[in-house]
Amino acid sequence: MSLKILIAPNAFKGSLDAVKAAQAIQQGLEHSALHPHCTLQPIADGGDGMLEVMLAQTESKKVYAEVEDPLGRSVKAAYGLIQNGKTAVIEMAEASGLRLLIPEERDPRKTSTFGTGQLVKAALDQGVSEIVVGVGGSATVDGGLGIIQALGGILTDEQGNPVPRGANGLSVLHSLDTSQLDSRLQTCRITVACDVTNTLVGAAEVFGPQKGASPELVAEIERHFLRYSQLVKSHLRKDITYLPRGGAAGGVAAALYAFLNADLVNGTEYLLAKTGFQAALNQSDLLITTEGALDVQTQSGKGPFYVAQQSKKQGKPVIMLVGSVPKDYSPADYQDYDAIFPIGPRPQSLSEAMQYTAENLERTAYQLGNLLAIKKP
């Protein structure tokens, strides 16, 4: 009887999305001596790749809209319609993602979430009753001001002028007026799939540098976030200062909670619940997952850690295929995985490794299949 393997990979950031990673592993296993029965269950945590994972595993339709990128340029962004068009799935990175900018353009003072707000509006035009927003992979630290502006919120400075885009808007924000927000939001449920648990205050220090913020700018944005949370508390009667997950995507999660009454959820758990992961796991003998770079963050609730925990609860073995392992690797730190295999064939540069991720995954899965096919004497 064929071994039943559940393939639940995470994306290799900047190299290979989770859907293609799953297909590469399947190819390798099926060409091996093992000849297993494979079920593909790619995972995401709310960040880059969430949309493709949802579309690949549900009855869905991909829709496009012309919106603004983080710097206000026109970009064609995709979103999905699932559940017979009743629910829209928006990946924030499609409109406001770091991947849309070259390194020299990363400047949180100017980058805005306005385009994501336009995607929300486009989804409302489709008549949906629920919108799921995956908020990872953003280029922004604007506290979600751009989204609120795109949806009709009036955010002004001390002179009554609209605040500028980006974190520059946070620096002069004085008044919040929600009276002109799109009225359709009142009957639409908003769910935010978060990839981190960080709070609003403290988020700039953690995520600002990767989005182009200098240490001085990080400290400045932290002060603005604190003042912003005080404004929200006085205007909207909601405390977002230390709201769990509120710091996701530079404060977008906190804004959607405060202005749109959104529910903030663990992105991985939400996606797996929607795509039937538990049922697939119940029918499997073994789980294979992946991670680009294995490190301590892998164990902080990220997708691979979550699926590994679920598998171990059922007493099923877990194999992890990784792009790299840390120099200070210790098996004691990764006890949820029965075996960890680096996929690199030889010492190579990061750019070369990223170029051949699919090939490396397929080859490693092929050898893994041959290993699993060896019969005990």
Question: Where are each of the predicted segments found?
Answer:
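N-terminal loops that bind phosphate or other acidic moieties
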Residues: 2-135, 139-377
